[in-house]
Design a protein with these regions (language model features):
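Conserved, well-ordered active-site substructure
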Residues: 155-177, 227-283, 288, 293-323
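A short, charged
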Residues: 136-153, 212-225, 280-291
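Active-site-adjacent helix-turn-beta-strand microarchitecture at beta-sheet edges
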Residues: 151-235
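Short, glycine-/Ser/Thr-/acidic-enriched flexible segments
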Residues: 111-113, 151, 182, 190, ...
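Zymogen propeptides
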Residues: 2-174, 182-185
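Short, solvent-exposed aromatic-acidic interface loops
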Residues: 121-126, 190-193, 257-261
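A short, polar/proline- and glycine-enriched secondary-structure boundary/capping micro-motif
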Residues: 126-130, 194-200, 230-232, 263-268
Length: 323
């Protein structure tokens, strides 16, 4: 494992610095604003794990929460089985040339959904804070992890992690993983963090869109955009993607589809991604940050091949499960 600096999000950061050079940015204030908004780390909460897992709290407490585990598990290849959790990762591929696709499915069954945890890059909540997924996973003792919603590139959204509200700025369609093991999509602008926690939210994610509801692909997802921030890729077209779905309470599927790599995997459209979850039996499914951020980790190593380059890219958060 390397301790070198995480790869910047080139699709955004290179655009910003490149544009600055091309234009000369005569107004120094414009340069300072861009650096502050997109590159400079801003930490709102340090030692974030000290606050997570405390029911109904805001990120202002001092106690430390620890994940529970039976500790009797066995790893065989990309499968983990214990008395309270099962993880099975399978590779898939189809097509060739420009129609090639490669994806990985993690089928996860838990006795208790609180085994599905969140971790922030550098154990800090804020903006522009990134770290390699394998490094975040190692820091918390994760066996399995996927990239999250990259909350740190935005300052909006309802962000509840491990039962703790870190941000309450409703903006888009969110997803809640409830303490009863179910998943629910919702309009953030119609609720707030306190209400969601009161209703039993364990994790919330703020990216989207919702792909599947009631076992059916959501209509119109092929035209939706999530963020219009400068430097953002469109989420439409054929792209690498990360998502999660719920088959039944405490039974989840996590899917990463590689892309932007000719001959290996071109990626997948939003509608086809949603259909993939339906084919897996998901009743609800939700789209997370994709592109070069699409990354799955198991037992300390990358499972997929981001952008066909076998290289990690720094991200702001992961969802993870321990042994």
């Amino acid at each position: 494992m390397t301790n070198s600096r995480p790869t910047p999000r080139l699709s955004r950061r290179t655009i910003i610095t490149g544009a600055a050079g091309a234009l000369g940015l005569a107004a120094a204030g414009g340069t300072a604003w861009a650096l502050d908004r997109y590159l400079i780390e801003h930490t709102d909460v340090t030692s974030a794990s000290d606050y997570q897992g405390l029911p109904g709290t805001q990120a202002s407490g001092t106690a430390t929460a620890t994940a529970t585990s039976a500790g009797d598990g066995v790893i065989e290849g990309t499968t983990y089985t214990s008395s309270d959790r099962q993880i099975t990762i399978t590779p898939h591929s189809s097509g060739s040339g420009n129609s090639a696709k490669a994806w990985y499915v993690a089928d996860v069954k838990l006795n208790d959904v609180t085994a599905l945890r969140n971790a922030f890059a550098k154990n800090s909540f804020g903006t522009n804070i990134i770290e390699y997924p394998t490094a975040i996973a190692e820091n918390v003792g994760a066996l399995f992890a996927i990239n999250g919603d990259y909350y740190g590139f935005r300052d909006t959204g309802i962000i509840i992690r491990d039962g703790v509200a870190f941000r309450d700025e409703p903006a888009r369609q969110g997803l809640a993983i409830m303490r009863d093991g179910t998943m629910v999509s919702y309009d953030e602008t119609g609720t707030n963090a306190a209400k969601l926690i009161s209703d039993g939210a364990w994790q919330t994610l703020s990216f989207g869109p919702t792909l599947v509801d009631g076992g059916t692909v959501i209509e119109g997802i092929d035209t939706l955009e999530i963020d219009t921030n400068f430097g953002n890729h469109s989420i439409q077209g054929t792209q690498p993607r990360t998502g999660l779905g719920m088959i039944a309470a405490n039974h989840f599927v996590f899917v990463v589809v590689d892309g932007r790599s000719a001959g290996y995997s071109n990626g997948i459209t939003m509608t086809d991604f949603a259909q993939l979850f339906v084919d897996l039996g998901a009743r609800v499914a939700y789209n997370l940050d994709g592109g070069g951020s699409t990354q799955m980790v198991f037992n300390g190593s990358l499972v997929n091949n981001p952008l066909g380059k076998n290289k990690e890219r720094g991200t702001s958060d992961i969802l993870w499960i321990g042994k």
